[in-house]
Amino acid sequence: GEDFKYNEMWIQGSGEEGKAAAEFISTMNPLGDAPEPGEGPSKESRENGNYDVLFCADLDDQTIKASVSGDMDPGYGSTSKMITESAVCLVKDCKDLPGGIYTPAASMGEKLIKRLERNAGLSFKVE
């Protein structure tokens, strides 16, 4: 809505600590430490992994919590299932979507959540 605000930051101290953090971020190469092909987690690790992520938002005098959990390794097993279900949802459930650039949540919303819960081993909760 009109009053929606989003902010993401990494808070650091001033002076040398802040300068060091800024220099670190500006020189990072996020793909530089990526594993080479075949160096990722084992099949057993991918299939037996899981995750539970908690999001918290302060709104007026209350805190709203939402969580997402998955039944496989988030980097391999769950991601591939999310991409696949997003593609199927886009083709089957969102045929009338007007043109433009959307995030999966904005374009498919509840339809995608239902698919992910039904077919991809994900669980979404809001407290």
PLM-predicted stretches and their roles:
Residues 1-127:
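C-terminal catalytic/substrate-binding lobe primarily of soluble NAD(P)-dependent oxidoreductases
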